[in-house]
Amino acid sequence: MSNVTRQVTPPKARPKEVAKACVDAGFRAYRISTDSRGGSTVDRFENVNRVFELCKQVREGVGKDGAWCIDFHTELDMPDAIALANRIEPLRPYFVEDLIRSENPGVYRTLRHQVKVPIAVGEQFGPKWEWNELIENHLIDYARATIPNVGGITEFQKIAASCETHYVGLVPHFTGPISEAAMVHCCAAFSGPALMEMVMGGTRPWPYLNQSYDLRNGKLWPNDRPGLGVELDASKLQLIGDYKDHYELTPMIKRPDGSFTNW
C-alpha cells in the first residue's frame, strides 16, 4: 500500500531537502500543512504568501515526477482558501486537504466550481451519512475517513464502497498504529486509488506493540498474522492524560485585529 508521509519540516532543514528524502525513501507523496498553529496571532494574507513559497520548494524537492500534497487545516476563510488553491495549481499537488471548515460540507459545491486542484476532506467526519452529499455529488476527490472517527471497520467499509462507485479515492487519516493496521487491510480490498498516511515517515517506534505493521521501502504491507496483524502489549501502555475533571482547550488563534479565527 503506497504511503503519504506527514512530517513537519525539522529545524535547520530546507523543505525541499526533506521532501526529496521522503520520495527517495520510497514514499508515494510528501504532505505539508499551512502550519499556523505555532503562534496565537496569524495574518492570513502573509500566511498565504508564505505557504505558496513553501509549496514551490516542496515541488522542487519531490521533482517533476514526485507527488506532494498540503493540508489547509480548515484555517483559511473562503476567499483565501480559493486564492491559495488556485496559486498552487500549477505546482500540481496530489490533493489539497481541508480547505475550509468542515461544519458545512455543502459549501464544497462552491469550492468545486472555483478551484481545479484535487480536493481531500473528511478526517473530522463521522459515519456514512456525513459523507453522502460529498461523495454522491462528486464534490471531493479523496476521502480522509478514519476508522475510530467513523465508528469501526464495518462503517469504514461502507464509506469505502460508496467512494469506489463514485471514483473517490481513500487517504485514511492517521489516528494511531492500531487503527492504521486495520486500515491497511481495508484499503488493500479497495479497487480505487488509496494512500496510507504515516506520521514522521513511519519511523517512530511504538513501544506498546510487540509486533507492528510491515513497512518496507515506504510501503505498508498486509501480513498473515492473526487479527489486524499487530500485537498489543498492555503492560507497556502509559496514561497520557486524565480528563475527568478538566480538559485542555484547543489553541485559540486570532487575527491581527484581535478577532478569533478557526484553528
How would you describe each model-predicted region?
Residues 2-4, 217, 224, 234, ...:
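Pocket-edge structural micro-motifs
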Residues 59-62, 92, 187-191, 241-244:
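Structural signal for hydrophobic packing residues in well-ordered secondary-structure cores
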Residues 228-263:
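Extended hydrophobic packing segments that form well-structured cores
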Residues 86, 92-95, 103-227, 231:
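Shared catalytic-loop signature of beta/alpha-barrel
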Residues 38, 204, 210, 254, ...:
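Short leucine-rich amphipathic alpha-helices used at interfaces
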Residues 2-109:
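Metal-dependent enolase-superfamily TIM-barrel catalytic cores that perform enediolate-based chemistry
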